Amino acid sequence: MAATAEVIPAGEVIACHTVEDWNNKLKAAKESNKLIVIDFTAVWCPPCRFIAPIFVELAKKHLDVVFFKVDVDELATVAQEFDVQAMPTFVYMKGEEKLDKVVGAAKEEIEAKLLKHSQVAAA
């Protein structure tokens, strides 16, 4: 029997706590050919705490997009791979391509780039 692929749930923010878990889930998300939005966050970061419930609401509204949350202290190597310098940082990607980045808890900019890239991803 073939190995089962990682299931990527729609409508929720996927938190990864190990590099192995991150690699498996990111691979599955890339293979889904959906837009991916990654929130690089930290528990000690007030703007991160401010934007977290908004990010959850975006995930509930945009079922065709995969939303990840990565704690930069927990997965420091992943944050380094994405050149995260400040929190929160939101990275937009599709497949292997990094499309965009938002640094800071700028709700309007986060949502605008989400809409822009999800329309491109759907085309």
Swiss-Prot record:
Record-level GO BP terms: defense response to fungus; heat acclimation; protein complex oligomerization; protein folding; response to microbial phytotoxin
Pfam families: Thioredoxin
Keyword Oxidoreductase: no
Localization (cell): Cytoplasm
GO (cellular component) term, any one: cytosol
Keywords: Cytoplasm, Disulfide bond, Electron transport, Redox-active center, Transport
Domain of life: Eukaryota
Cross-referenced InterPro entries: Thioredoxin-like_sf, Thioredoxin_CS, Thioredoxin_domain, Thioredoxin_H-type-like
Domain spans labelled Thioredoxin: 2-119
Disulfide bonds: 45-48
Entry's Gene Ontology molecular function annotations: mRNA binding; oxidoreductase activity, acting on a sulfur group of donors, disulfide as acceptor
Family: Belongs to the thioredoxin family. Plant H-type subfamily.
PANTHER family according to UniProt: THIOREDOXIN, THIOREDOXIN H3
Function: Participates in various redox reactions through the reversible oxidation of the active center dithiol to a disulfide. The H form is known to activate a number of cytosolic enzymes.
Protein name as annotated: Thioredoxin H-type
Source organism per UniProt: Brassica oleracea (Wild cabbage)
